[in-house]
């Protein structure tokens, strides 16, 4: 059962919003606003009249996303609407009061979706196994349904540069494909445009910004599930690279925007068969060993 609590004009609560910026935080904030604004411009993430659903989990990434979008909204070249949306999955111990109080104090329109996906995942996934994959699918479905029902034209997620690079290596190492996490995508059913405005922002900058702003962070370990061993290994690898070779993560991120099909091996992206003097090539089957007749012995 799904319940939606919609509070477009939140009442005043005895809670505080983000901390007022100091000099150092203001410099970081300017850099992050510039990076987010650049990503929005580069990929056409937000257009005039868009109604943007900002998915807020209570983690540092989504808090930072909402905070920066609210700041950019005041000076954006086009008008757009922002609504914070949280999916309450009924995890045991989830502090349901935190987000409503924070958003009410901030004066931000918000909606809370109440859907008990935790019980579903707990029933289906054996104890000790990671719940993240199924939980993610159920969460995505709930958010897509909500976006459709309430007329949202954009769904904004808090994935950042490090997430995109990690996904690239997850696909490379474990799925034998060069694919990552796009800054903007159309959902499989063609009904939703998903945007990731933090695509150019590094995770360590988000962590510093969130700490300086004193966001009321909600732990992501309430469900007792942990990230997969594979993703944890990739994360440790990237963290080590970042320490040993500063700038490497940014270089990898830039490489994802400079793909050269002619220097890879995907024949669906580049016509290798057309290269040569005549532009003609025998069919692949003709080169298979079992397709070439043996020459009879004399």
From Swiss-Prot:
Organism: Stenotrophomonas maltophilia (strain R551-3)
Name of this protein: tRNA-cytidine(32) 2-sulfurtransferase
Stretches the record annotates as Disordered: 1-26
Further comment: The thiolation reaction likely consists of two steps: a first activation step by ATP to form an adenylated intermediate of the target base of tRNA, and a second nucleophilic substitution step of the sulfur (S) atom supplied by the hydrosulfide attached to the Fe-S cluster.
Catalysis: reaction(s): cytidine(32) in tRNA + S-sulfanyl-L-cysteinyl-[cysteine desulfurase] + AH2 + ATP = 2-thiocytidine(32) in tRNA + L-cysteinyl-[cysteine desulfurase] + A + AMP + diphosphate + H(+)
Pfam families noted in UniProt: ATP_bind_3
Keywords, alphabetical: 4Fe-4S, ATP-binding, Cytoplasm, Iron, Iron-sulfur, Magnesium, Metal-binding, Nucleotide-binding, RNA-binding, Transferase, tRNA processing, tRNA-binding
Subunit structure: Homodimer.
SUPFAM superfamilies: Adenine nucleotide alpha hydrolases-like
GO biological process: tRNA thio-modification
Span of the annotated motif PP-loop motif: 57-62
Cofactor(s) needed: Mg(2+); [4Fe-4S] cluster
Any Gene Ontology CC annotation: cytoplasm
GO molecular function: 4 iron, 4 sulfur cluster binding; ATP binding; magnesium ion binding; sulfurtransferase activity; tRNA binding
Protein family (similarity comment): Belongs to the TtcA family.
Pathway: tRNA modification
Cofactor note: Binds 1 [4Fe-4S] cluster per subunit. The cluster is chelated by three Cys residues, the fourth Fe has a free coordination site that may bind a sulfur atom transferred from the persulfide of IscS.
Lineage of producing organism: Bacteria, Pseudomonadati, Pseudomonadota, Gammaproteobacteria, Lysobacterales
Coarse class of the protein's main subcellular location: cytoplasm
HAMAP family: TtcA
InterPro entries: Rossmann-like_a/b/a_fold, TilS/TtcA_N, tRNA_Cyd_32_2_STrfase, tRNA_thiolation_TtcA_Ctu1
Location in or out of the cell: Cytoplasm
Positions bound to [4Fe-4S] cluster: 132, 135, 223
Function: Catalyzes the ATP-dependent 2-thiolation of cytidine in position 32 of tRNA, to form 2-thiocytidine (s(2)C32). The sulfur atoms are provided by the cysteine/cysteine desulfurase (IscS) system.
